[in-house]
Amino acid sequence: MMPLLDKLREQYGVGPLCSELHIAPSTYYHCQQQRHHPDKRSARAQRDDWLKKEIQRVYDENHKVYGVRKVWRQLLREGIRVARCTVARLMAVMGLAGVLRGKKVRTTVSRKAVAACDRVNRQFVAERPDQLWVADFTWVSTWQGFVYVAFIIDVFAGYIVGWQLSSSMETTFVLDALEQALWARRPSGTIHHSDKGSQYVSLAYTQRLKEAGLLASTGSTGDSYDNAMAESINGLYKAEVIHRKSWKNRAEVELATLTWVDWYNNRRLLERLGHTPRQKQKKLIMLPSETMIWQPEFTDKTLSRKPGAVQ
């Protein structure tokens, strides 16, 4: 509003303009003084300006997906002491908010082949790295058709150990994600848990698991809770990357996914690791020091009226 008053004051005068806008002329002059003499502003106003820059930086550096809670936690990690309510207030003024998760779309096509038993029973618990992996895939709509993205996650630290993109839902693309994970981790005796999708219960996939010394496990048909951790990663991926823009082609999705996986594995704050990135938890990830129990990301209290807000 002040720039508008500055523009019209010569033509109409400050008094008449303030009268029409129901503002006291003293308010206008006070704002003018603060703009021209920033050092005369209150300590709180000056600190707010500085905090806004820091909040915007943290928000931009983390793919613009963080809500109040994670922005606040990141600021604390950097040694910036600030109250959570202050971050919430300033983010509201700046128009910044965490991304919202969308509804899940069914991609599982069950196959009538004999599937492995459920070795997990919804207990996503791991005492060491590579004790339990979960796998699933999701889809992305592009201008040139659908793209499918498969992930394999190590439950111990929530680390994405393998992923792959494809233009079709054939078994080969989930096999490629598995091969990447096997090459990266060299596991032995790992439980591999998935849904009963035709790709995961196919002869080729189950045979490769057996050759690699992995123990196959599948949840029940049509029940997302039986593979809840993998579903949660899919939800984060869709909310933090896919739902934020339209996509031209597979190459564009692949580059964005590569960037996100690197950020997710190394820099994204994780609540169950004490709001620290996995990169800072190398010892925790590599040593079987304690049992890790998977928990879904919780929404911020400030966004409690918007279920599914990713913080």
Residue ranges and their predicted role:
Residues M1-Q281:
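Charged DNA-binding/catalytic regions of mobile-element recombinases
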Residues Q279-K283, K306-Q311:
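N-terminal, intrinsically disordered charge-dense segments
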Residues M286-L287, Q295:
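N-terminal amphipathic/hydrophobic targeting modules at extreme N-termini
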